[in-house]
Design a protein with these regions (language model features):
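A short amphipathic helical element positioned immediately N-terminal to and/or at the very start
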Residues: 23-38, 144
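Hydrophobic alpha-helical transmembrane segments of ABC transporter permease domains
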Residues: 35, 46, 101, 113, ...
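An intracellular "coupling" helix at the cytosolic face of ABC transporter transmembrane type-1 domains
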Residues: 31, 35-39, 133-134, 152-159, ...
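ABC-type nucleotide-binding domain
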Residues: 2-5, 356-609
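Helix-loop-helix
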Residues: 71-75, 179-193, 263-337, 341-342
Length: 609
């Protein structure tokens, strides 16, 4: 969980709406991502090739059986059953062997598909860990979820089938063509003539379909974002009578997805009938000329039977190849979205040699002195923090106040290294945080956020989240210290009570008390409290304040609060406006100045009265 800026989350403007911009590059990146399994791919390809070739000879063997029988009848002799039985045995053996090899090939490609799916999901999750928080501020959650779920599923489901189908279709097509040319060059030319004509028509159709398929994937990501936001924000939607407007917004995107899907499927579905029309014309021509050739003795009846079977099946691999084109486009469109995500700019690399040990040396005590030295920070091009400097002594409780957008939360984001300053330095016990690893800096702090995050699981599991080797007894002790132990024990299953997915079976105040308990358990060296009492009742607020006072005792701590009554006991209050510290001092000193802080405090006091 991390702190967010106050800015509104922006829509991702870089989502590709036209499919793979560079087909060759997308294909190259796709190959580079799967080449670690090239041995499996080669094995699957060889097995598919053998299985297909065995099936290709089926009509030829049937033709030989027909020729043997008709020649015997033509010569008014006894049918050579031994030859026919032998050919029948060869035919059955061929089909069985092809089926067994095909099964083995299917197992290999399925395992390859599962491995690749696992790799993609792991890569996306690892990438998320390395991305700066700013990326998630600008990118809708649903879009990232769409890449991890929908796009990965598209590749996983289609990849194995497509790999097999490509090999099978091309092998079948080439095998049929070679045997057809062997049986009759003239008849083969009639069949082949239909291919380029149908290809021209189909290519133009698929070119248009590609655009709709890519747009469909993009719109699906937007729809996921809307669904996720509507689902998690139902309480706010209903409280503000916003349901009808939300439905209209959903319907608009849903209709857009419907139209794009309909257009994509309509154009994609044209490939089969178009191919069928041209190949059926060729089929009619072959039947007419083939009949003449049989009568003329140019080709045997078994030969023309085999040729017609090949021709009858000839359209299948061509149709499959045509349909594969659209499937490949979908795969590459999904793959490109994933690869683009994996190539997003990451956080700056960690320092090779961390200076963390300098402040955690066994020979010296950790103090908790924090200094901001001439810090400047801009979010995109908007300046947020301007030449910010302050030195905080060990053990001080520092409150940061100011209007929305003043830069309060950004200060904490910089302190936790969720962002790094554009200029200036942040030091802890005299060591620059930029010269420590991010996880080392974050280990120094315990955080209690306004947006309390509890996952679906037991209360005990939630309280132990992030802690290392904590016993149940330590959890009980921390809960008693915070004052939440009585509440937990009053639940049906106590500490083993399962919190629902949205943790809506406990109140906001109880959630915050639990997050404070979690912080107590982690025994942090310093503390951060971000507006954690701004949406609870007065009694719970007092419980939280008491718990926080115990937690911050002797620790350097930072408090961000809009309710200024909660930070009257702070050692130092920093008053911010437009990224600058305009006032600082304790509560009494700032009131005596009768400045901006006094104005804020008195206005809130008047509202409370």
């Amino acid at each position: 969980m991390c702190l967010r800026k106050g800015e509104t989350k922006m829509q991702d403007k870089n989502i590709n709406s036209q499919g793979p911009k560079d087909f060759k590059n997308a294909l190259k990146r796709f190959w580079l991502s799967i080449r670690e399994w090239k041995i499996k791919i080669i094995v699957a390809a060889v097995l598919s090739l053998i299985s297909t070739l065995l099936m290709v000879f089926g009509p030829m063997i049937l033709g030989m059986m027909t020729t043997s029988a008709t020649e015997s009848l033509k010569n008014q002799s006894v049918i050579n059953w031994s030859e026919i039985n032998f050919l029948a045995f060869v035919l059955i053996a061929t089909f069985l062997l092809s089926a067994v090899i095909g099964y083995i090939q299917g197992v290999v490609t399925s395992s390859l598909s599962v491995l690749y799916e696992k790799k993609l999901r792991n890569s996306i999750l690892e990438k998320m860990r390395r991305l700066p928080i700013g990326y998630f501020d600008k990118t809708p959650n649903g879009d990232v979820m769409s890449r991890m779920i929908n796009d990965v599923d598209m590749i996983s489901v289609s990849f194995a089938e497509t790999l097999t189908q490509i090999i099978t279709s091309f092998t079948t097509l080439v095998g049929y063509l070679v045997i057809m040319l062997y049986l009759s060059v003239t008849l083969s030319l009639i069949a082949i003539f239909a291919v380029p004509i149908s290809t021209i028509f189909i290519s133009s159709v698929l070119k248009k379909a590609k655009v709709y398929f890519a747009a469909e994937r993009t719109t699906l990501g937007k729809l996921n974002s809307i669904i996720e936001e509507n689902f998690s924000g139902q309480l706010i939607i209903k409280a503000n009578n916003h349901a009808e407007k939300s439905i209209k917004g959903f319907d608009k995107i849903n209709d857009q997805l419907y139209n794009e899907s309909r257009q994509a499927q309509f154009l994609s579905s044209l490939t089969f009938p178009l191919t069928h029309v041209f190949l059926n014309l060729a089929y009619a021509g072959v039947c007419m000329l083939g009949g003449y050739y049989v009568i003329s003795g140019v080709i045997s009846i078994g030969g023309i039977q085999a040729f017609i079977q090949y021709l009858n099946r000839f359209n299948r691999p061509i149709t499959e190849v045509a349909q594969l084109s659209s499937t490949i486009q979908q795969i590459l469109a999904a793959a490109e979205r994933i690869f683009n995500f994996l190539e997003e700019v990451e956080e700056k690399p960690e320092v090779e040699k961390s200076l963390f040990k300098q402040i955690m040396n066994k020979d010296r005590k950790f103090l908790g002195e924090v200094e901001f030295r001439n810090v400047n920070f801009s979010y995109d091009v908007k300046p947020i923090i301007k030449n910010f400097s302050v030195k905080i002594k060990p053990g001080m409780q520092v409150a940061i106040v100011g209007p929305t957008g003043a830069g309060k939360t950004t200060i904490v984001n910089l302190l936790m290294r969720f962002f790094d300053p554009n200029e200036g330095e942040i030091l802890i016990d005299g060591v620059e945080t930029s010269k420590m690893r991010r996880d080392e800096v974050r280990d120094l702090f315990g955080m209690v956020l306004q947006d309390t995050w509890l996952f679906s699981g037991t209360i005990m599991e939630n309280l132990k989240y992030g802690a290392k080797r904590v016993s149940d007894e330590e959890v009980y002790k921390a809960a008693k210290l915070v004052g939440v132990d009585h509440f937990i024990k009053s639940l049906p299953n106590g500490y083993q009570t399962v919190i629902s997915e949205d943790s809506d079976n406990i109140s906001a105040g109880e959630k915050q008390l639990m997050t404070i308990t979690r912080a107590v358990i982690s025994e942090p060296l310093m503390m951060i409290l971000d507006e954690a009492t701004s949406n609870v009742d007065t009694r719970t607020e007092q419980l939280i304040q008491d718990a926080f006072s115990k937690l911050t005792k002797g620790r350097t701590s930072f408090v961000i609060a809009h309710r200024l009554s909660t930070i009257r006991e702070a050692d130092l209050i920093l008053v911010m406006r437009e990224g600058n510290i305009i006032e600082q001092g304790n509560h009494k000193e700032l009131l005596a100045k009768n400045g901006f802080y006094a104005e804020l405090y008195n206005s809130q006091f008047s509202e409370d009265v």
